[in-house]
Amino acid sequence: MAFPINRGIVPTAKKVVIYGPEGIGKTTFAARFPNPVFIDTEGSTKEYDVARFPAPTSWQMLLDEVAEVKKNPQICRTLVIDTADWAEAACFAHVISAGQVKSIEDFGYGKGYVKAKEEFGKLLNELTEVVNAGVNVVVTAHAAMRKFEQPDEMGSYDRWEMKLYTSQKTNIAALLKEWADMVLFANYKTFAVKDKNSNKAKAQGGQRVMYTTHHPC
């Protein structure tokens, strides 16, 4: 049986993740995408003239709103989930409720976190279906400074990571990054300037920068 071989770029909708510290402009940037509809979980779009779904009050409601776009892709060209932090918290709450326990730790042996990762994966699968329907998907996330251990001459240092649960068994931040076609990090660009009088370095600047490749910041 012969299979046809295609060559060249295949135009498709994009899966984009934007993360950065609070107030950097993640929502503003997401609103620049073509004809966006927001699933605004934190009320971040109150001052924006954008289309939005009702704020989801549960994990299931979030999945239902995503499914609505999958069934009716003509309603927008970009679906924005703002933010992944809230989605993760709703996912954990759903797993706890479904398991009839009081805490994610009550499952024992890290099973609760594994269940949460599997459940979050369902959301990413649904979002992939939205992309396959021709709609861009943008997911925003807050960032937090964490210590990063590197087994080489660089040793350990602090760097910005998504403010999502991270462990050896369950790394939802890594899952989200692997899912995305494009991972963008927004931050303030600062530089150190020595004070002539005290000879101490002070941080100056504050220009907003979007990093599109890996950066130790």
Question: Predicted regions span which residues?
Answer:
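Conserved P-loop
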Residues: 2-93
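A general structural signal for short secondary-structure junctions and capping/turn motifs
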Residues: 8, 28-30, 72, 129-130, ...
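Short, well-ordered beta-strand core segments
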Residues: 36-38, 137, 183-185
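Glycine-rich loops and low-complexity Gly/Arg-rich segments
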Residues: 43-45, 61-65, 103-106, 163-165, ...
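Structured helix-beta-strand junction loops
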Residues: 75, 133-134, 179
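Conserved GTP-binding G-domain of TRAFAC-class P-loop NTPases and closely related GTPase folds
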Residues: 149-217
